[in-house]
Amino acid sequence: MLAFNFFGATEGGLFDINATLPLMAIQVVALTYILNSLFFKPVGKVVEKREKFVSNNIMEAKNKLSEVEKLEADLLSQLQSARSEAQKIVSDAENESDKLYKEALELANNEANASKEKARLEIENQTSSARDQLFKQADDLSELIVNRLILEK
């Protein structure tokens, strides 16, 4: 018996086949069922619910991000068009200002030329009038001299 015990297992060992093994199997199945119904299913539902919540939030965030990017692009295009419009308005205002400046300068030059021409004509008239008066006075004086010379002779 000693030789048999040396090679084999003793009674009540791990590999004894009796009612304990099926009872342990039933306990494992029952424990698995109880844990599944009381712990794993509710935890699984909570995990699924949380996963759904997270995926919905991620989807919403992606949608909002795409909407923000679209709005940003729209605002950038509006800003660009506003800048170009403002630049056009400034350019038009500068052109109008230059045009008004040139018109005012031309008008001032025309008025100055007209005044100059008027002054020249007035000076010419006065010169002509003075010359005529001098000629008349010279005629009168020469007539007076001639009359005195005639009277003295």
UniProtKB/Swiss-Prot annotation:
<dbReference type="InterPro" id="IPR034679">
    <property type="entry name" value="ATP_synth_b"/>
</dbReference>
<keyword id="KW-0812">Transmembrane</keyword>
<comment type="function">
    <text>Component of the F(0) channel, it forms part of the peripheral stalk, linking F(1) to F(0). The b'-subunit is a diverged and duplicated form of b found in plants and photosynthetic bacteria.</text>
</comment>
<dbReference type="InterPro" id="IPR028987">
    <property type="entry name" value="ATP_synth_B-like_membr_sf"/>
</dbReference>
<dbReference type="GO" id="GO:0046933">
    <property type="term" value="F:proton-transporting ATP synthase activity, rotational mechanism"/>
</dbReference>
<keyword id="KW-0375">Hydrogen ion transport</keyword>
<dbReference type="InterPro" id="IPR002146">
    <property type="entry name" value="ATP_synth_b/b'su_bac/chlpt"/>
</dbReference>
<keyword id="KW-0138">CF(0)</keyword>
<keyword id="KW-0066">ATP synthesis</keyword>
<keyword id="KW-0472">Membrane</keyword>
<keyword id="KW-0793">Thylakoid</keyword>
<keyword id="KW-1133">Transmembrane helix</keyword>
<comment type="similarity">
    <text>Belongs to the ATPase B chain family.</text>
</comment>
<feature type="transmembrane region" description="Helical">
    <location>
        <begin position="23"/>
        <end position="40"/>
    </location>
</feature>
<comment type="function">
    <text>F(1)F(0) ATP synthase produces ATP from ADP in the presence of a proton or sodium gradient. F-type ATPases consist of two structural domains, F(1) containing the extramembraneous catalytic core and F(0) containing the membrane proton channel, linked together by a central stalk and a peripheral stalk. During catalysis, ATP synthesis in the catalytic domain of F(1) is coupled via a rotary mechanism of the central stalk subunits to proton translocation.</text>
</comment>
<dbReference type="GO" id="GO:0046961">
    <property type="term" value="F:proton-transporting ATPase activity, rotational mechanism"/>
</dbReference>
<keyword id="KW-0406">Ion transport</keyword>
<comment type="subunit">
    <text>F-type ATPases have 2 components, F(1) - the catalytic core - and F(0) - the membrane proton channel. F(1) has five subunits: alpha(3), beta(3), gamma(1), delta(1), epsilon(1). F(0) has four main subunits: a(1), b(1), b'(1) and c(10-14). The alpha and beta chains form an alternating ring which encloses part of the gamma chain. F(1) is attached to F(0) by a central stalk formed by the gamma and epsilon chains, while a peripheral stalk is formed by the delta, b and b' chains.</text>
</comment>
<dbReference type="InterPro" id="IPR050059">
    <property type="entry name" value="ATP_synthase_B_chain"/>
</dbReference>
<dbReference type="Pfam" id="PF00430">
    <property type="entry name" value="ATP-synt_B"/>
</dbReference>
<keyword id="KW-0813">Transport</keyword>
<dbReference type="GO" id="GO:0045259">
    <property type="term" value="C:proton-transporting ATP synthase complex"/>
</dbReference>
<protein>
    <recommendedName>
        <fullName>ATP synthase subunit b'</fullName>
    </recommendedName>
</protein>
<dbReference type="GO" id="GO:0031676">
    <property type="term" value="C:plasma membrane-derived thylakoid membrane"/>
</dbReference>
